[in-house]
Amino acid sequence: MEPIEQQLTELRTTLRHHEYLYHVMDAPEIPDAEYDRLMRELRELEAQRPDLITPDSPTQRVGAAPLTAFNQIRHEVPMLSLDNVFDEESFLAFNKRVQDRLKSTENVIWCCELKLDGLAVSILYENGVLVSAATRGDGTTGEDITSNVRTIRAIPLKLHGDNIPARLEVRGEVFLPQAGFEKINEDARRTGGKVFANPRNAAAGSLRQLDPRITAKRPLTFFCYGVGILEGGELPDTHLGRLLQFKAWGLPVSDRVTLCDSPQAVLDFYRNVEKDRPTLGFDIDGVVIKVNSLALQEQLGFVARAPRWAVAFKFPAQEQMTFVRDVEFQVGRTGAITPVARLEPVQVAGVLVSNATLHNADEIERLGLRIGDKVVIRRAGDVIPQVVNVVLSERPEETRPIVFPTHCPVCGSDVERVEGEAVTRCTGGLICGAQRKESLKHFVSRRAMDVDGMGDKIIDQLVEREYVHTPADLFRLTAGKLTGLDRMGPKSAQNVVNALEKAKATTFARFLYALGIREVGEATAEGLAAYFGTLEALQAATIDELQKVPDVGIVVATHVFNFFAEESNRDVIVQLLAEGVHWPAPVVINVQEIDSPFAGKTVVLTGSLSQMSRDDAKARLVALGAKVAGSVSKKTDLVIAGEAAGSKLAKAQELGITVIDEAEMIRLLGA
């Protein structure tokens, strides 16, 4: 066997292995960027020796074989994938190839859209009624996922409108918004269930459940982007026209679709989407660029596995491989001990990453991680980098186990793990320097007491020099004492003292949030403040009374009750009030006297609003007698769903709670 034949055989074997892990097992071992590199290497070798191309080469087909647990559906029109480009030069070369093949000097009109990172599916409608749905599978045969697709509320079971074809197969992507993904993993960590590496794996795992009732509980959604079968009807003769027609029939289509009349316009679209990527609310890994004219698409045709008239312009990889050099343990404000992987520095999505969170001991066990392992690191948007999985096939010989501490790495106190919780905590409380620092940083933060100019480095020095032990000590600081800190001159010191004085005037809700009670976020603090009205009433509340507050269950109620039962916490509150911390007396709202559809209702906001900020919406709802909660429960009366609403919307639908959109909210606010 020639050396090049050996290379081809090894590359094909490696790619098939990773295709199986990705498409069939939903458990990829390497990042997409590494797979793309291997595929490019195979293509280049096959281009050198086309006589060695085999029919079963990964370059000659789309994906991997379907699972046998599902019935199979044969695609009447093959579901092809797209070729990729990774930089401007490659895209411009693709643009030139298209123009050369069309023998045209005029610019091609491109239709540009998002490259969603989910699971490709085909959905067949007959006379407007959904009759079947399938995964891509190997491009020729997919898995029958009809029962599961029917549970996705974004997908209409019946199309509406005129001139619907007798048989219409639409193609698109099923995906999981980031909020839904985080909620699924949060629940899994709490219950010991399967934790997904990323939203794409979670979407695939949710869609390919044998029990559709499980799929129905997952907040999956869908965007349509193409067509397969078309019989007994007509569609517009442009790609954008078809998308608009699909939308008119009730199929969801992304609103980020743009026509570009030049290569430069395409590059501008790419850059704008890349910039907006962290705020979309769902994962994408590039943009898709298609010739808009169907006539030109037909003229350009296909190669073995992809159309010549479209390409995926991928973003820099959000996943990379590197090595874990060590694991250190950090202590948070509630005593939670978090393992952090110290990595061989690696560029991920344009950022040099040298640390990644490992969450807790259960996560380390789930990953099977050892110090010295080669791992896949993921960084998406502003999310803290995390270890996705261990590359077991490349585990070095010299690795060592990760030993979770039995004593706090900062203060030496015992650690404990409460039964049913995933988190291990230091029991030292405020004698622990780490907990003290983090508690004080939380107390002065913008959403809490909002002490302008008091950053983390100042807090670190104040604790290390023993100037401050409790939040009340902050208000006793003088400009003279602050001037002794590093990089703190007289003017800066006086500014901090002035900011502390200004921060004394706050709100009851901000004060509660600043105290750092476990499980009490901003929304819960607002709910407690609105329900009890005064600190005295809240401190006297029983666990049963606390549970009457929207968004407060037994766990939160117990944490609040225990916080106020602790004498040292009550002492700190007394000291804070003695130092002049105050807030306005509560305004008593008699909801029975308010003529508003929101009066007396428990309302939850989810998704992003376009007409007003979330804070403005909350304020207007509260002014009209509503109680605004942070999560959906049986106590919820109404959910207001903005764009990219995730798990809260899904739970509301599951519980049969009334849901309205932003436009309806604005109409009712003015009613």
UniProtKB/Swiss-Prot annotation:
Listed EC numbers: 6.5.1.2
SUPFAM superfamilies named in the record: BRCT domain, DNA ligase/mRNA capping enzyme, catalytic domain, Nucleic acid-binding proteins, RuvA domain 2-like
HAMAP family: DNA_ligase_A
Naturally occurring in which organism (per UniProt): Salmonella choleraesuis (strain SC-B67)
Binding locations of NAD(+): D32, A33, E34, Y35, D36, S81, L82, E113, R136, E173, K290, K314
Active site: K115
UniProt record, GO biological process: DNA repair; DNA replication
Name of the protein described by the UniProt record: DNA ligase
GO molecular function: DNA binding; DNA ligase (NAD+) activity; metal ion binding
Disulphide-bonded residues: none
Assigned keywords, A-Z: DNA damage, DNA repair, DNA replication, Ligase, Magnesium, Manganese, Metal-binding, NAD, Zinc
GO CC, one annotated term: cytosol
Binding site for Zn(2+): C408, C411, C426, C432
Domain BRCT: 593-671
Cofactor(s) the record lists: Mg(2+); Mn(2+)
